[in-house]
Design a protein with these regions (language model features):
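N-terminal adaptor-interaction module of cullin-RING ubiquitin ligase components
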Residues: 1-231, 241, 247, 252
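Leucine-rich repeat
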Residues: 2-3, 11, 78-88, 91-98, 108-136, 139-146, 165-173, 194-201, ...
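Ordered, helix-dominated protein-protein interaction surfaces in large eukaryotic regulatory proteins
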Residues: 16, 20, 37, 98-101, ...
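Short amphipathic alpha-helices and their capping/turn residues within compact interaction modules
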Residues: 19, 23, 40, 44, ...
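Concave beta-strand-loop units of leucine-rich repeat
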Residues: 100-105, 122-124, 148-154, 175-182, ...
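Leucine-rich solenoid repeat modules
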Residues: 355-358, 363, 368-529
C-alpha cells in the first residue's frame, strides 16, 4: 500500500527503470489510476519490439481508432468485424515512440496466423494494415523518437511519411538497413538531410553495386553534415565518403562513438586525418572487419585524440602481429570480444594475447572450432576476466567430436569459474544429463539472469528435464530460461511453462543473442528498439 503513494516524479523514474520488463509494467497498471496512467505510455511506446513472448492482440486495440472506411476495407479482406474492440481507455496510437517498419509488418503477419481464418491471408492485407497503422500514428501526432527503415519493407508507406514531415522531423535514432539504390531511396535521404537535424544515433548499412556507391555515399554525407547533435554512428558501406564527411562537420564536438561494421580497411588511409578532428571521441568498435593489418593499426595508434577501443569481433586474422600490437595499446579498454577465427595457430596466439592484455571484458562470445587439448586457454581467459564478465556465450556447434569429449570438458569445468552473477549465458553444446548436472552443481553460487541452452546432441532422446527442474527451477537460479534442440525446437510443454512460472522463472523461445546485440542491451539508441 505504501508503494502506491510514491511521489509522481519518483514513480516516473522507477517505471523508466523497468521499461524493458513488460511483466512488471503490466502489474503496475493494476495498482491505481496514477500508476496506470504512468505505465501505459511505456508499454505502448514500442509494442512491436518486445523481446519476450507477446500477445499480438494489441494490434486489434490499435484498429479500434481507424475510421469507418478503413474498417470496411479490412472487413472486405475477410477480417471478422468482431475483432474490433467496442471501446478503449486510451489513445494508444499516440504513445508510439519507436517505429520499425519491418517489425510492424512481421507482427501483423504473425497476428494474421493466430486468427487462422481461411479467407484472411490475401497478398495485400499486411500492407494495408501497416499503412493504416502508420496513418493512425501520424493522425494522433505521435512524437516519434526512433525510425528503422529496412529495404523491402518501406516502399508502400514511403510517400505517406514524406507527406507528413513533422512525423519524423524530431527523430533521435535513425537506422537505415540493407538499402539499395533507387529513386525513392535518394529522395528519402535528401528529405532526411533537409528535415531531420536532431539525430543523435545513426546506423547505416547499404548493399549496392559499385557504380551506385558514390550516390549513396553522397546521401549519407549530406545527412551527417546536416546534424547538430550526432553522438553515435555505425558505418558499413560506403565508408570513404561518409568518413570524410566527419571532417569540419557539426559533429566534431558531439560525436563520441564510432562503430565499424564489416568494413574492409584495405585502402582506407584517412583515419588519422579524420579522427584528429573529433574532439570528444570516446570509443570505437570494430565488428567483423577485414584487413586489420599493419597500415591500419599504425593509423589507429598514431591518432592524437584519446579514445578507447571498446569492442573487437573477429572472424578472421590475416596477420597476427598487427593485431597483437593493437591489443597491447588498447586491450586494457576492451569490453566486448568475440572470436570466430577458424585458424588454429592464430587462434591460440589470439587467446594468449587477449588473456594477457584484456582484463575488463564484459561480454565474451566464443565460437570454438579447435580440439580440447587447448581448452585451458579458454578457462584461463574466463578466469582472468571473471570480475567484469556479464555476458558469456560458448558455441561448439561446428566442432567435429564424435565422442563429445570437448563438450563434456566444457560442462565439467565451466561452472566453478563463473562469476557470482551473469546477465546472460548461452551454451551451444552436445549435452548429456550427467555433464549438465556437474555444471549446474558447480555453478550453484552463480545467479544467471538469462540462461540459454541449445543441445547439439545427436541423441534426440536424451532427457535433461529432471536435472533442470532440480537445480534451476527449485533453486531459482535464473530469471529467464530457454532450452532447445539443434533444430531450435523447445523442450517445454505448456504444463512445464506454468510450473516454472510458479517459481518466478519465465520460459522463452530460443533466440541466440549475438554479441553485437549486447552492445545495445537495454539501450534504445540503436539496434534493440
Amino acid at each position: 500500500m505504501a508503494f502506491s503513494k510514491i511521489l509522481p516524479e519518483l514513480l516516473g523514474e522507477i517505471l523508466q527503470y523497468f521499461r524493458q520488463d513488460y511483466r512488471i509494467l503490466y502489474s503496475c497498471i493494476l495498482v491505481n489510476r496514477l500508476w496506470c496512467n504512468s505505465a501505459i505510455p511505456l508499454l505502448w511506446e514500442n509494442p512491436f519490439s518486445f523481446m519476450r513472448p507477446k500477445n499480438l492482440h494489441f494490434i486489434e486495440i490499435y484498429l479500434y481508432d481507424l475510421n469507418d472506411d478503413e474498417k470496411t476495407k479490412l472487413i472486405e479482406y475477410g477480417m471478422d468485424k468482431n475483432l474490433f474492440p467496442s471501446n478503449t481507455l486510451f489513445k494508444y496510437s499516440s504513445f508510439i515512440k519507436h517505429l520499425d517498419i519491418y517489425k510492424i509488418s512481421k507482427s501483423i503477419e504473425d497476428w494474421d496466423r493466430t486468427l487462422a481464418t481461411k479467407n484472411f491471408r490475401k497478398s495485400n492485407f499486411t500492407k494495408l494494415i501497416c499503412r493504416s497503422l502508420i496513418q493512425l500514428f501520424i493522425e494522433n501526432v505521435a512524437n516519434l523518437h526512433s525510425l528503422h527503415v529496412l529495404y523491402g519493407s518501406f516502399d508502400d508507406i514511403f510517400e505517406l511519411i514524406l507527406q507528413n514531415s513533422n512525423f519524423i522531423g524530431n527523430i533521435k535514432n535513425l537506422q537505415l538497413s540493407h538499402l539499395e539504390m533507387s529513386v525513392s531511396i535518394i529522395k528519402f535521404l535528401t528529405f532526411l538531410s533537409s528535415n531531420c537535424n536532431s539525430i543523435s544515433s545513426l546506423l547505416y548499412q547499404c548493399y549496392n553495386h559499385y557504380e551506385h556507391q558514390q550516390m549513396m555515399g553522397n546521401g549519407l554525407s549530406q545527412i551527417i553534415k546536416s546534424q547538430k547533435n550526432l553522438r553515435k554512428i555505425l558505418f558499413r558501406s560506403p565508408l570513404y565518403q561518409s568518413l570524410l564527411s566527419l571532417k569540419n562537420s557539426n559533429c566534431s564536438n558531439t560525436l563520441n562513438t564510432i562503430i565499424f561494421y564489416y568494413i574492409e580497411f584495405k585502402n582506407i588511409i584517412i583515419l588519422n586525418e579524420v579522427f584528429n578532428q573529433l574532439n570528444v571521441l570516446e570509443s570505437i568498435h570494430i565488428i567483423y572487419c577485414r584487413y586489420l593489418d599493419t597500415k591500419f593499426v599504425q593509423q589507429i595508434i598514431n591518432i592524437n585524440k584519446p579514445f578507447k577501443l571498446k569492442s573487437l569481433f573477429l572472424h578472421e586474422v590475416s596477420q597476427f602481429e598487427p593485431l597483437d600490437l593493437l591489443l597491447q595499446h588498447f586491450g586494457c579498454y576492451l569490453e566486448n570480444f568475440e572470436s570466430r577465427v577458424d585458424s588454429k595457430p592464430q587462434l591460440l596466439q589470439l587467446f594468449k594475447s587477449v588473456t594477457k592484455y584484456c582484463r575488463k571484458i564484459k561480454s565474451l562470445y566464443l565460437h570454438l572450432l579447435w580440439d580440447y587439448r587447448n581448452i585451458n586457454l579458454v578457462f584461463n581467459l574466463i578466469e582472468n576476466i571473471k570480475q567484469s564478465l556479464n555476458y558469456l556465450s560458448i558455441d561448439l556447434c561446428f566442432v567435429t567430436d564424435t565422442k563429445n569429449d570437448f563438450h563434456s570438458i566444457i560442462l565439467q569445468n565451466l561452472g566453478q569459474i563463473l562469476p557470482f552473477k551473469l546477465e546472460y549465458l548461452n551454451l551451444c553444446l552436445a549435452i548429456n544429463e550427467s555433464d549438465l548436472e556437474i555444471f549446474l552443481k558447480n555453478s550453484q553460487n552463480t545467479f544467471i539472469k538469462e540462461l540459454s541452452i541449445k543441445n547439439e546432441s545427436h541423441d534426440l532422446y536424451v532427457t535433461i528435464y529432471p536435472c533442470i527442474k532440480e537445480y534451476i527451477m527449485k533453486k531459482k537460479k535464473v530469471k529467464y530460461l530457454t532450452i532447445s534442440d539443434k533444430f531450435n525446437v523447445s523442450w517445454f510443454s505448456s504444463k512445464d511453462i506454468e510450473e516454472f512460472r510458479l517459481y518466478d522463472i519465465q520460459i522463452l523461445k530460443y533466440s541466440y543473442m549475438r554479441n553485437f546485440d549486447v552492445l545495445y542491451k537495454g539501450d534504445l539508441s540503436m539496434l534493440l528498439w
